[in-house]
């Protein structure tokens, strides 16, 4: 299955009159943001699936590259996440990804990461699918066998030509030519690399490391770019998990669910009987409310703030000192 670009919001298909009518209909029902009702649903749920997006890590200080914040040096961030962009200018693409690696290496998991890790420890029938490539879920102690990194990892390195792969590369910068993307600045001061008005010295392809195995291909970030296939073995494992039994509850966290095939898991979970709970700042916006079906939940909150509260009946009070102890 290939990673597809974000689809237009389905709400654009409907007229404003229809959207308003749908909103009135759902408002008349039991509150979609009733924490007590969600707690009851959580307590009665055995098999739980989660789909996480960039919003999960936003409170850790990582940019989501969505909406108004979707530009990097005046480049649409999604336009840099393609193999064709890498072939056209590997230095520019690597600067973008080295910057992201640098930011992730300095970020720390937030309470939402820890809450999901705690849920995994308490419930062995919980499976988390993350679209994030930042490694923060792993840092929070999320059990590896209950975590699927759909889009790979910034800290894996692949070859553009052969099957060579290196896992767990934390070099910062990745290579000397990328040092401008690994600069630390004082809080409140601008990062020079992000100032599009400042000229950017081009990076020669000769400065990008070649594959140590085939000696032909370039080393590239081990993430899934738009148009590329997701890991087939991982995808088959997720399908098998879905087929094993009914799904009681699905958490959709920090994502507007516009990128496929990941977004398709929401419909698959519904077909297996799952109630859907969306935790995302835009979840209660009028243009999103048409998605909230009877019995489902929508919490227009930041995951770091709200997820520990929502999961509290199962995980208990989240320890505030976990960060210092980890």
Swiss-Prot record:
Pfam families: SIR2. It is found in: Mitochondrion; Cytoplasm, Cytosol; Nucleus; Chromosome. Zn(2+) binds at residues 159, 162, 211, 214. It catalyses: N(6)-acetyl-L-lysyl-[protein] + NAD(+) + H2O = 2''-O-acetyl-ADP-D-ribose + nicotinamide + L-lysyl-[protein]; N(6)-(2E)-butenoyl-L-lysyl-[protein] + H2O = (2E)-2-butenoate + L-lysyl-[protein]. Residues 1-26 form a transit peptide. Disruption phenotype: Increases crotonylation of LAT1. Accelerates conidial germination. Increases virulence in tomato. Its main location: mitochondrion. Substrate binds at residues 97, 100. One of its GO terms (molecular function) is NAD+ binding. GO terms for cellular component: chromosome; cytosol; mitochondrion; nucleus. NAD(+) binds at residues 53-72. It is an enzyme of class 2 (transferase). The active site is at residue 151. Keywords: Chromatin regulator, Chromosome, Cytoplasm, Metal-binding, Mitochondrion, NAD, Nucleus, Transferase, Transit peptide, Zinc. The keyword Zinc applies. The keyword Transit peptide applies. CDD domains: SIRT5_Af1_CobB. One of its GO terms (biological process) is negative regulation of cellular respiration. Its cofactor is Zn(2+). Disulfide bonds: none annotated. Gene3D superfamilies: SIR2/SIRT2 'Small Domain, TPP-binding domain. NAD-dependent protein-lysine deacylase that decrotonylates the PDC (pyruvate dehydrogenase complex) subunit LAT1 at 'Lys-148' to inhibit PDC activity and consequently ATP production. Also decrotonylates histone H3 crotonylated at 'Lys-18' (H3K18cr), to repress the expression of genes involved in aerobic respiration. May also act as a NAD-dependent deacetylase. Does not mediate desuccinylation, demalonylation, or deglutarylation of LAT1. PANTHER family: NAD-DEPENDENT PROTEIN DEACYLASE SIRTUIN-5, MITOCHONDRIAL-RELATED. Interacts with LAT1; the interaction is direct. This is NAD-dependent protein deacylase SIR5. It comes from Fusarium oxysporum f. sp. lycopersici (strain 4287 / CBS 123668 / FGSC 9935 / NRRL 34936).
